[in-house]
Amino acid sequence: DEAKTMLGRTQGNIQAIRPLRDGVIADFIVTEEMIKHFIKKVHKRSTFANPRILICVPTGSTPVERKAIQDSALAAGARRVQLIEEPIAAAIGANLPISEATGSMVIDIGGGTTEIAVMSLGGVVYSNSLRVAGDAMDNALISYMRKEYNLMIGDSTAEKIKKEIGTAIPSSNNTFLMKGRDIRSGTPKEIELTEKDACEALMPILNQILGGIKEALENTPPELSADLIDMGLVLTGGGALLKNIDKLISQDTGLPVTIADDPLSCVAIGTGRALE
């Protein structure tokens, strides 16, 4: 979080880098250093720690992308590296009964990807990975501000808008005082944004997620589809915290939608349980 707040604010000789983008490695060297840092935080007393590591990957990641992740972890000092697909980890963390003979559907809206999966009897019946999620929402807000208000804003400001007034269905008169740089004059400028503005900016991304969910439902076997009427759909990931996103998905699919307890931590919790 400390590094994230530095995005767009660093000195000329300092560069803020995202090691991962869209759920896969964007910078091999920085990813290796990041994993080394995490290992040191866990094994504070051991200089020669070489732990077993379990890493989540998007279901749509390629064999090359998966190997790159494993290679980074091994280079960082891991003794053994295993991979788990994100929706499985999310479902475990959300306490879904994936080992039972009933169908469960999880929608994990993370930073780089949205993972959609239908599971039953401990396996994945259908999965889809969309490379649109929280980061794409931020980019949509940046583009909207530029197009509608000639205002240039950064990633951290876009994320703040998303958290403050971002919504899938406008339901209040909440506003947000937006500050940025006027593209034409180059001077600082501020405008007042409404929930309706934020929703309009986010809707193209939300429509892609809705399309992915519909595709998953169309590819679900009839027996499991019947289970989903009772079980509903479960949302995890930071994107699940977007206001009214559960209502939007429920309206679009006609199915009950619930947000998991502590959606931000579901993938991490599920990965930890799987490692045990």
Task: Describe the residue ranges of each PLM region.
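Nucleotide/phosphate-binding catalytic cleft detector across ATP-hydrolyzing
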Residues: 1-109, 117-234, 240-276
